[in-house]
């Protein structure tokens, strides 16, 4: 009997696939049955090797060794994943395995995960591709009924390979170069560095912003509030207020315009991450994690998509989903829905995967048993689908213009004619008590009936003081939008996206910036740290330009479509890397001090009186000729089970003694409170002793 070897990206997905295709017999590292062997990777089983693998000298960071440009790429298997790789290789080598099915995630990264394993194992057997957008049983069955030749995805693999190798070249060389120059580990990335630059540029604009005061005179006439234009001078505003209070107000024009707000598009990953951050405060990574979990539970379609449409042939699916969701969701109860599906169907705007929508399995199961974050995210996706097919929001915008005391005043109002999709949206947000959106404009009020030429004798007036506002700091919502547009603020909504990273990678980029200490979260805001600001300012434009990096991403997309040359792309990256090393061989002494860690003063040296600083492993005197040093791992404290913390060190330096709780007796092992004395004899090592003991 011959077998097809199916390789999934992770065990949970493998189990779902095995259950559908009948591979129900568990083996060590795989499942078997019905002519299939189903096994799995554990994420990236095989990765590009570190620089030190190519040459022993690359294990140390030296400028003279740069640039590092591998001629023949090498790969490694992490020790903790070697067993599963060996399982896959042995399955590939079985004589009864005649072919493979690549069932990793249907995207660029999933393709790379499979191909690296396939090549590292030296496999030459033919393989097919499972390409699905849902983990529902029906979708898996349909996917296996329509498997595609693996060679159809060779271009996608080349794109993924170029991305991985380009990230390696830029990351390894630029990180080593600038770390060597500035004497501090400075992680540089092809995508993360331009993203950091976007944050730094925004904070620079905020810090340099000069606010300006202005005034607005507001009048009330006939129950309507109308406002003047901005007035810079306070005295002028007060004079106008006084004049208005003794003058007539005359309505000189009334305009009424019917306006329509079309329903929103469905979610792609980026718009889902943005809205989940805005409404629930989820980070981009949290949203992706929740979406992936829901996908694997068969309740949500494939999340790593850049499309906001469904394919034309999905009309029956969309109709079934909407009719099933409508009675299921409390916030939709009682609303009349005449769904219009034309706006959500467009096969021309779907490449690899359609928009994110709930599955029919969710319609059958509901929200029971889900974690709170999963419930919120799934409900958000359901709401978006219903909003997208609901009626447009229609209202009448009214603008009334008045003259009073020789000045012009404007009143604005709106009358809702058809609530449409906005009523659904309002109900959803109310049901989940979503975070308030500070940037949302005040809702316009309805204006009373008014006609041109109408006069008002009784006018009240007031002056309000205002200030021009700086740009707002980025949140994950607004930064994801900026990444999608490569930092450009003036692109039209329908412009072709040439963004930083991909929907699938942006979350990890933001997390890495935080982990590296270049960005910090403060509430919902993402703010560059001092090191982050300095790094973005000292790096050359070739590494920090969002537009340039977006062009690379566009070229990677073209490679995936077979429209660009992988070798040409990599040659360009290598040339850029050579130029980088050649142009940055040295920097000024002042620049070298940019990333020096600010030393924390603990106290005064008992020997010479200079400042004592905290180091990584000790507390040391700042006077280089003085040898005073207190080691954090001093045997005295280790034997007594206490960490030699800065508070103890500071007390010893100030008073020569420190009260310490919980010292461990070296005789009995019991703890006690005591006073530690600094017994410095002026030698190489500092001594300590306990003055007194008091049992607990």
What positions do the PLM features span?
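Intrinsically disordered, low-complexity regulatory segments
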Residues: 1-164, 168, 470
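Basic, low-complexity terminal or inter-domain segments flanking catalytic cores
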Residues: 2-5, 92, 151, 175, ...
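Amphipathic alpha-helical transducer elements in NTP-driven molecular machines
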Residues: 11-18, 35-38, 42, 78-89, ...
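Metal- or metallocofactor-binding catalytic centers and their adjacent structured scaffolds
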Residues: 234-267, 273
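Conserved short loop/turn motifs at secondary-structure junctions
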Residues: 2-5, 103-106, 183-185, 256-265, ...
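Flexible glycine-/small-residue-rich
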Residues: 8-9, 40-42, 104, 170, ...
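C-terminal or mid-to-C-terminal helical accessory/interaction module adjacent to the motor/catalytic core
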Residues: 73, 95, 137-221, 256-260
């Amino acid at each position: 009997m011959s077998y097809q070897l199916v390789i999934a990206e992770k065990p949970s997905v493998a189990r779902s696939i095995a259950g559908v295709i009948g591979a129900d017999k568990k083996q060590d590292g795989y499942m078997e049955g019905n002519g299939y062997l189903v096994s799995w990777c554990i994420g990236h089983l095989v990765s590009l090797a570190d620089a030190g693998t190519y040459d022993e000298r690359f294990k140390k960071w030296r400028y003279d060794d740069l640039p590092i440009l591998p001629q023949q790429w090498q790969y490694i298997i992490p020790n903790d994943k070697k067993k599963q790789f060996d399982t896959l290789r042995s399955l590939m080598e079985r004589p009864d395995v005649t072919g493979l099915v690549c069932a990793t995630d249907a995207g660029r990264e999933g393709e790379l995960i499979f191909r690296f394993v396939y090549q590292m194992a030296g496999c030459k057997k033919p393989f097919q591709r499972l390409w699905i957008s849902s983990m529902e049983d029906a979708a898996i069955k349909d996917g296996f009924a329509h498997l595609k030749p693996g060679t159809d995805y060779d271009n996608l693999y080349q794109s993924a390979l170029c991305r991985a190798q380009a990230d390696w070249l830029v990351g390894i060389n630029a990180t080593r170069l600038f770390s060597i120059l500035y004497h501090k580990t400075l992680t540089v990335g092809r995508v993360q560095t331009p993203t950091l630059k976007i944050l730094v540029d925004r904070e620079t604009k905020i810090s340099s912003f000069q606010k300006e005061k202005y005034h607005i005179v507001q009048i009330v006439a006939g129950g309507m509030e109308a406002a003047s234009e901005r007035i810079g001078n306070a005295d002028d505003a007060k004079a106008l207020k006084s004049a208005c209070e003794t003058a007539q107000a005359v309505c000189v024009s009334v305009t009424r315009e019917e306006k329509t707000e079309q329903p929103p598009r469905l979610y792609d990953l980026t718009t889902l991450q943005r809205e989940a951050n805005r409404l629930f405060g989820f980070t981009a990574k949290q949203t992706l994690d929740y979406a992936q979990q829901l996908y694997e539970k068969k309740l949500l379609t494939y999340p790593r998509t850049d499309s906001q449409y469904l394919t034309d042939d999905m009309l029956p699916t969309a109709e079934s989903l909407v009719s099933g969701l409508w009675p299921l969701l409390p916030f939709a109860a009682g609303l009349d829905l005449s769904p219009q599906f034309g706006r959500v169907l467009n096969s021309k705007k779907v490449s690899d995967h359609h928009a994110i929508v709930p599955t029919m399995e969710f319609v059958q199961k509901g929200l029971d048993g889900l974690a709170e974050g999963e419930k919120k995210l799934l409900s958000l996706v359901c709401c978006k689908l219903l909003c997208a097919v609901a009626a447009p929001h229609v209202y009448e915008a009214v603008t009334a213009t008045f003259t009073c005391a020789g000045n012009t005043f404007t009143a604005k109002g709106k009358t809702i004619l058809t609530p449409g999709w906005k009523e659904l949206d309002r109900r959803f947000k109310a049901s989940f008590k979503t975070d308030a959106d500070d940037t949302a404009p005040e809702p316009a009020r309805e204006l009373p009936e008014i006609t041109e030429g109408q006069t008002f004798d009784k006018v009240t007036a007031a002056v309000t003081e205002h200030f021009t506002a700086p740009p707002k700091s980025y949140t994950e919502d607004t930064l994801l939008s900026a990444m999608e547009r490569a930092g450009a603020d003036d692109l039209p909504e329908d412009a072709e996206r040439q963004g930083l990273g991909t929907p699938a990678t942006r979350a990890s980029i933001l997390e890495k910036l935080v982990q590296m200490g270049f960005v910090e979260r403060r509430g919902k805001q993402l703010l560059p740290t001092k090191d982050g600001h300095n790094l973005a300012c000292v790096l050359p434009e070739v590494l920090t330009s969002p537009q340039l990096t977006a062009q690379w991403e566009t070229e990677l997309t073209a490679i995936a479509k077979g429209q660009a040359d992988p070798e040409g792309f990599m040659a360009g990256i290598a040339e850029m890397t050579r130029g980088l090393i050649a142009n940055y061989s040295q920097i000024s002494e002042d620049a070298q001090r940019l990333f020096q860690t600010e030393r924390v003063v603990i106290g005064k040296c008992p020997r010479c009186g200079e400042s004592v600083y905290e180091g990584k492993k000790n507390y040391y005197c700042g006077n280089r000729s003085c040898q005073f040093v207190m080691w954090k791992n001093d045997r005295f404290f280790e034997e007594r089970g206490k960490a030699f913390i800065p508070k103890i060190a500071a007390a010893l330096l100030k008073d020569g003694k420190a009260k310490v709780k919980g010292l461990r007796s070296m005789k009995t092992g019991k703890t006690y409170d005591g006073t530690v004395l600094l017994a410095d004899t002026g030698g190489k090592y500092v001594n300590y002793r306990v003055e007194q003991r008091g049992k607990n």
